[in-house]
Amino acid sequence: IGISENVGPQANLGRQGSENAFQAFSKVFFNTQFYPEVPLQNLSYLGQVKQIKQPLDRPEATQMVQELDRLILDLLTQHVAPDQIPIIVGGGHNNALPLMRWASANGKLSVVNIDAHADLRPTDKRHSGNSFSFALEEGLLENYGVYGLHEAFNNAAIRNQLTNPQISHRFFEDYLQGPYQLLDDVLGFVSHQHHAVGIEIDMDSIAYMPSSAFSPSGWSLDQIRTLLLKLG
């Protein structure tokens, strides 16, 4: 499922650009040759959700995010079976919330997030920075693991939320200085869950990856590929 929108980042006072991710992905993906390592016959392309207007201001962007939440949840409910795995490409991190609402309705759910930000901002208004705040508040998650957080991107209020016993986390700086390994942390988290586990890969966790929170410091693309191959 492609989602070409930028209202989530705009409602969070971020930069535009997330609306272009699916177009960049699809140019390559839809020209992929069949090869035995990946069962392409098991993949279905449902379509693309496309933003057709820009919000006039932040309040309108917030309202549009709420409308998008409902649209994505309806789309998943009507067209994706409980035993299928939806893969969302593009858009802001706000789209994690309707995914979690859909998945948790079909059974217990935990999520692992590779992210420089915890996405635990206050729930006073919807935007790309508070999907997991809403998910925990609504009781959608059994556990939440977020790895590769950047110290400078997570304030005292967010760090206080990280003390929640449902949350497992580690800062990117800990990986730079200590004996910790991302792969070990994520596989350890997943192995302790006895139910469905969702995966979010935030593009700003990858060094030099174009995103609304671009950073030259982060994981390499090959490290993320290795992680996903191991999880698969």
Where are the regions a protein language model picked out?
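Conserved alpha-helical scaffold segments that buttress catalytic/binding sites
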Residues: 2-232
